Design a protein with these regions (language model features):
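PLP-dependent amino-acid enzyme catalytic core
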Residues: 1-413
Length: 413
């Protein structure tokens, strides 16, 4: 089983006495969980691959949970790794794959994190879970809290897509819309509320929660039959996905279950790209920026707080990079992903495809490289991003002549 070996601060090395503390009492850094997965063998890899449980929990040994009875699962994980041949041809990439997390229970990658996070909350006996979110985490925490029998409170900034708020409400969450910026006013109130009311904190500062995102690496190792792609491109806000994925790859590498690791790429919106800025400057820490408005609202985070440095370290250790893309590039990538790969993604998810195009155009990645773009959220999370005109839906007379005129515009005859 996956037993917690230690909880420690990766910055100063301090190990707190309690496993329920999330922040280092010495340097205020975010703590990290080390799971003792024992002396696993290649036979164990095959056993896990062949498990009837195809959720992330077939990798139970790698997660910080003592008892299987504590698991809170909605069937998350083992999402399709699809060859995107037509999309690849358009981008000039011969071996392009998309990892389709739009099919996860609440439609986003956050389900990987919150299945683990809420399982820990159940094991510890918490009654209420809380999160502040630009939308996707709100819905996911609400769903997994409902499955766990735990109350949920979610705080979102004003302007969050109504579809995401409605989804969280549908799962029974108490949704509070805050007038203010996500990185500052919302964050300040959230931190005070968690301390005041003793709620279980489901933010990325929770070192248990994002252990779930290690499953990206586990699944790709399985789906590539023990091999690794050359590059994995991931839409990035605070960087926990990059960090956790790299941690998962290193765990499998240490066991000999894979022979090499991929280069990781953090894809950010130009309107909120503190990780890209720090990577390009060659500095070890993140400097917060004021996030501007962007169509990629799920990754509109200008202040990764004390977490971003781990993503930077992972990018550099993997030999990868970080890249920012514009809203126009994101919307173009969203349209291409739908029309050429058959996957409807929200704008934030499309940043991985936009980044792949930009990296190919600049020669950073080669035509023959094996590329995976993580598609992290469903397009129905933010349907208003599809900019249609009323003219496209103007009714026509029910005649073949009118139909010919209508469809001729779309070049399908």
């Amino acid at each position: 089983m996956g037993m917690i070996d230690k909880l420690f601060c990766p910055k100063c090395g301090h190990q707190p006495a309690s496993q329920t503390v999330f922040q280092c009492t010495d340097c205020r850094g975010i703590l990290e969980v080390h799971v003792n997965f024992g002396q696993l063998t290649a036979a164990d890899f095959q056993r896990m691959r062949q498990s009837r449980d195809q959720s992330i929990w077939r990798w139970f040994d790698f997660f910080p949970l003592a008892q299987r009875s504590s698991i809170v699962s909605l069937g998350e994980g083992n999402t399709p790794l699809l060859p995107a041949t037509r999309l690849g041809e358009k981008l000039g990439i011969a071996n392009l794959y998309v990892k389709n997390d739009t099919v996860l229970p609440t439609g986003s990658l956050k389900d990987r994190s919150n299945s683990v996070g809420l399982s820990v909350a159940r094991e510890w006996g918490f009654k209420t879970a809380a999160v502040m979110s630009t939308g996707n985490a709100a819905a996911s925490v609400a769903a997994y809290s409902a499955a766990a029998g735990i109350n949920s409170v979610v705080m979102v900034p004003a302007g969050t897509a109504a579809s995401k708020i409605i989804q969280a409400r549908a799962y029974g969450a108490t949704v509070v819309v805050i007038d203010g910026s996500f990185d500052y006013e919302v964050a300040k109130l959230y931190k005070a509320a968690v301390q005041e009311f003793g709620w279980y904190d489901c933010l990325s500062s929770n070192p248990y929660r994002d252990e779930g995102k290690k499953s990206y690496a586990y699944e790709m190792a399985d789906q590539f039959d023990g091999e690794s792609p050359d590059w994995v491109i991931h839409p990035t806000a605070g960087g926990t996905g990059i960090y956790a994925m790299w941690k998962g790859y290193k765990e499998f590498l240490s066991l000999g279950w894979i022979q090499r690791t991929p280069k990781l790429v953090a894809a950010q919106s130009e309107a909120a790209a503190p990780i890209v800025a720090a990577f390009e400057r060659g500095v070890p820490d993140i400097e917060a920026v004021i996030a501007r408005e962007t169509v990629a609202e799920s990754i509109q985070v200008g202040n990764p707080a004390s977490l971003g440095w781990r993503a930077l370290a992972a990018l550099r250790e993997s030999g990868g990079t970080a890249i920012a893309v514009s809203d126009s590039e994101i919307l173009e990538a969203q349209a291409l992903t739908g029309s050429l790969a058959g996957v409807f993604v929200e704008p934030a998810a499309a940043t991985s495809v936009a980044a792949a195009k930009k990296l190919r155009d600049t020669g950073v990645i080669g035509r023959g490289d094996i590329i995976v773009c993580n598609l992290t959220g469903h397009g129905l999370k933010q349907p208003e991003a599809i900019r249609l005109t009323d003219k496209e839906f103007t009714p026509i007379a029910p005649t073949l002549d009118m139909l010919r005129q209508q469809i001729a515009r779309f070049e399908i005859m």
